[in-house]
From Swiss-Prot:
Keywords: Sporulation. Present in an increased level in yabG mutant spores. It comes from the Bacteria. It comes from Bacillus subtilis (strain 168). This is Spore coat protein T. Inner spore coat protein which seems to play a role in germination. The lineage of its organism: Bacteria, Bacillati, Bacillota, Bacilli, Bacillales.
Length: 82
Protein backbone atom coordinates (compact mmCIF):
# COMPACT_ATOMS: atom_id res chain seq x y z
CA UNK A 1 0.00 0.00 0.00
CA UNK A 2 1.43 3.26 -1.03
CA UNK A 3 -0.95 5.63 0.76
CA UNK A 4 -0.25 6.51 4.41
CA UNK A 5 -2.31 4.64 6.96
CA UNK A 6 -2.93 7.49 9.37
CA UNK A 7 -5.63 9.72 7.99
CA UNK A 8 -4.20 12.84 9.67
CA UNK A 9 -1.77 13.45 6.87
CA UNK A 10 -4.71 13.76 4.47
CA UNK A 11 -6.10 16.80 6.25
CA UNK A 12 -4.30 19.98 5.60
CA UNK A 13 -2.48 21.19 8.68
CA UNK A 14 -2.20 24.96 8.69
CA UNK A 15 -0.40 27.04 11.31
CA UNK A 16 -3.79 28.50 12.21
CA UNK A 17 -4.98 25.16 13.52
CA UNK A 18 -2.37 25.10 16.26
CA UNK A 19 -3.00 28.66 17.31
CA UNK A 20 -4.03 29.31 20.89
CA UNK A 21 -7.32 31.13 21.35
CA UNK A 22 -6.86 34.85 21.83
CA UNK A 23 -8.20 36.14 25.10
CA UNK A 24 -8.86 39.84 25.31
CA UNK A 25 -7.11 41.48 28.24
CA UNK A 26 -9.32 42.01 31.22
CA UNK A 27 -10.61 45.58 31.42
CA UNK A 28 -9.23 47.60 34.27
CA UNK A 29 -11.63 48.39 37.10
CA UNK A 30 -12.67 52.03 37.30
CA UNK A 31 -10.41 54.27 39.33
CA UNK A 32 -12.07 55.66 42.41
CA UNK A 33 -10.05 58.23 44.37
CA UNK A 34 -9.46 57.06 47.92
CA UNK A 35 -12.08 58.07 50.41
CA UNK A 36 -10.56 59.33 53.61
CA UNK A 37 -12.77 58.66 56.60
CA UNK A 38 -12.73 61.36 59.26
CA UNK A 39 -10.01 60.59 61.74
CA UNK A 40 -11.46 59.17 64.94
CA UNK A 41 -10.43 60.51 68.30
CA UNK A 42 -7.35 58.60 69.27
CA UNK A 43 -8.40 57.63 72.79
CA UNK A 44 -11.67 55.96 71.85
CA UNK A 45 -14.53 57.61 73.67
CA UNK A 46 -17.63 55.45 73.97
CA UNK A 47 -19.74 58.59 73.55
CA UNK A 48 -18.63 61.26 71.15
CA UNK A 49 -19.42 64.89 72.05
CA UNK A 50 -22.88 65.91 70.97
CA UNK A 51 -23.12 67.64 67.63
CA UNK A 52 -24.13 71.29 67.90
CA UNK A 53 -27.86 71.83 67.89
CA UNK A 54 -29.04 74.28 65.29
CA UNK A 55 -32.40 75.85 65.90
CA UNK A 56 -34.70 75.67 62.90
CA UNK A 57 -34.94 78.81 60.80
CA UNK A 58 -37.86 80.99 61.79
CA UNK A 59 -40.65 80.97 59.26
CA UNK A 60 -41.11 84.10 57.22
CA UNK A 61 -44.05 86.23 58.37
CA UNK A 62 -47.40 85.20 57.00
CA UNK A 63 -49.41 87.95 55.37
CA UNK A 64 -52.89 86.82 54.40
CA UNK A 65 -53.24 89.37 51.61
CA UNK A 66 -51.76 88.96 48.17
CA UNK A 67 -48.57 90.60 46.94
CA UNK A 68 -46.53 89.66 49.98
CA UNK A 69 -44.78 86.45 50.78
CA UNK A 70 -46.73 83.76 52.53
CA UNK A 71 -50.14 82.30 51.79
CA UNK A 72 -52.36 82.60 48.75
CA UNK A 73 -49.53 82.39 46.29
CA UNK A 74 -47.26 85.11 47.63
CA UNK A 75 -44.80 87.03 45.50
CA UNK A 76 -45.77 89.96 43.30
CA UNK A 77 -49.39 89.49 42.38
CA UNK A 78 -49.45 85.76 42.98
CA UNK A 79 -52.41 83.79 44.23
CA UNK A 80 -56.06 84.61 44.72
CA UNK A 81 -55.97 86.85 47.76
CA UNK A 82 -59.27 87.68 49.45
Amino acid sequence: MDYPLNEQSFEQITPYDERQPYYYPRPRPPFYPPYYYPRPYYPFYPFYPRPPYYYPRPRPPYYPWYGYGGGYGGGYGGGYGY
